[in-house]
C-alpha cells in the first residue's frame, strides 16, 4: 500500500480535473475529449457522453475502494460513482435497450441514439450497467451495428478449427454512422 499512498494525491487531483473540465454543469455526465482511440473524428461539443461517463464511473468506483484500503475519506468517490450511474440510466439509457452515444449540450439537447461500438463495450467493461442492460446492449450490436462478412475459401483444416463454413465469419463495424464524422 505504500505505492498507493504515494500516488493517492495524483488520483485525487486527476479525478478533480476530470470533474472540473468534463462535467462543469455537475449533471454527472461527462464530455469526451481525446478519451478513446476514435477521438480525432468525434465532436461531442461538451455533451453528455456514454463512454466518458462510464470511464469516470469506474474511476470513482475504484478510487473509493483504494481510499477505503488507505483509510482515507472515500464517501465523495462512492457518491460520484453512484450519481454517474444514476445519470447514465436517466439520461443516456434508451428504451430500445442500449446506451445512447451522447446528448447534446446546447440547442435542443438531442439524444444521439445510434451508439457506436465503444458506447456498448465501455459501460459493460466499466461495470456501469446491470446484467440485463449489458445483455440488451449486446443485442443492439447484433441488430444495429453492421456485420461485414469475411470472404474466404473453405479449407477443411480451418473448418475444423473454427467450426464454421465460409459464410459465417464477420467483422463488426464500429458504428452505423454515415458519414463517419459528425458534429
Pin down the residues of each PLM region.
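Acidic, glycine-anchored loop motifs typical of Ca2+
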Residues: 3, 28-32
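Active-site core of glycosidic bond-cleaving carbohydrate-active enzymes
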Residues: 5-16, 43, 47-75, 79-82, ...
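Glycine-rich, aromatic-flanked loop segments that form ligand/cofactor-binding clefts
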Residues: 19-23, 29
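Nuclear receptor C-terminal ligand-binding domain
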Residues: 24-25, 56
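Aromatic- and acidic-residue-enriched carbohydrate-binding clefts of CAZyme catalytic domains
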Residues: 31-47
Amino acid at each position: 500500500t505504500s505505492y498507493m499512498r504515494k500516488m493517492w494525491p495524483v488520483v485525487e487531483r486527476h479525478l478533480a480535473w476530470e470533474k472540473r473540465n468534463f462535467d462543469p454543469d455537475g449533471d454527472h455526465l461527462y464530455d469526451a475529449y481525446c478519451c478513446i482511440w476514435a477521438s480525432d473524428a468525434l465532436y461531442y461539443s461538451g455533451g453528455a457522453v456514454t463512454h466518458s461517463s462510464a470511464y469516470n464511473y469506474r474511476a470513482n468506483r475504484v478510487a473509493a475502494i483504494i481510499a477505503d484500503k488507505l483509510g482515507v475519506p472515500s464517501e465523495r468517490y462512492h457518491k460520484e460513482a453512484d450519481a454517474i450511474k444514476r445519470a447514465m440510466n436517466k439520461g443516456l439509457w434508451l428504451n430500445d435497450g442500449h446506451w445512447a452515444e451522447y446528448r447534446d449540450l446546447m440547442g435542443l439537447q438531442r439524444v444521439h441514439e445510434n451508439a457506436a461500438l465503444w458506447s456498448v463495450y465501455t459501460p459493460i467493461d466499466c461495470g456501469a450497467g446491470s446484467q440485463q442492460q449489458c445483455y440488451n446492449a449486446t443485442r443492439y450490436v447484433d441488430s444495429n451495428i453492421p456485420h461485414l462478412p469475411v470472404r474466404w475459401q473453405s479449407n477443411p483444416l480451418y473448418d475444423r478449427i473454427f467450426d464454421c463454413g465460409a459464410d459465417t465469419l464477420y467483422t463488426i463495424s464500429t458504428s452505423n454512422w454515415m458519414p463517419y464524422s459528425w458534429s
